[in-house]
Design a protein with these regions (language model features):
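Residues that flank catalytic or metal-binding motifs in active/ligand-binding sites
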Residues: 93, 113, 137
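N-terminal capping segments
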Residues: 1-81, 93, 100-102, 107, ...
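Glycine- and charge-enriched low-complexity intrinsically disordered segments
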Residues: 132-146
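Short, well-ordered loop/turn sites that connect or cap secondary structure elements
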Residues: 85, 90-92
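A generic local structural motif
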Residues: 83-85, 104-105, 127-128
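Catalytic Cys-His active-site segments of thiol-dependent hydrolases/isopeptidases
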Residues: 108-130
Length: 146
């Protein structure tokens, strides 16, 4: 699959509002459901796959990441070298970036090349931002088994 096809699917979610545990394009999605739904639409994940249930604030109160466990079931870890800017050489379109927001990994986004991440902002919905904004939070990268 070409990068432009991956990017096209990711961008169809742009502007969708944040809604906890929702996965409806144009209506509501959260940072966990977003990459899963993109992967389903691209044929990388089975249509019947369901994510685990999770509370909104679990990352604030735990030292382990529910998200990391979920990522390990669907994706392969991508070794990253160097800082957040130089590590983009290791990434491919559609890779999932795990960000440590509190005590553990608590937010996900998708890499779209050009040192940019698409993620679901709680107030602004699905947006594109420079990956450099998350230099301190970048914890790991993951790739769907395609």
């Amino acid at each position: 699959m070409e990068d432009k096809e991956i990017l096209a699917e990711i961008l169809t979610w742009k502007g969708t509002r944040w809604r906890h545990m929702q996965a409806v394009k144009g209506e509501g999605v959260d940072c966990v459901q977003f990459p899963v739904m993109v992967a389903k639409n691209l044929g990388w994940v089975s249509d019947d796959y369901k994510t685990i249930k999770y509370s909104r604030d679990w990352a604030t109160h735990n030292d382990f990441s529910v998200l990391t466990r979920e990522l390990e079931t669907l994706l392969e870890a991508v070794p990253l070298s160097g800082d957040v800017i130089s590590c983009t050489d290791d990434l491919r379109f559609g890779d999932v970036l795990a960000l440590k927001m509190e005590r553990c990994v608590g937010h996900l986004g998708m890499y779209i090349g050009n040192k940019q991440i698409v993620h679901v902002h709680i107030r602004r919905g699905v947006i594109i931002e420079p990956i450099s904004l998350y230099a301190k939070q970048l914890h790991s990268a993951w790739r769907f088994k395609r």
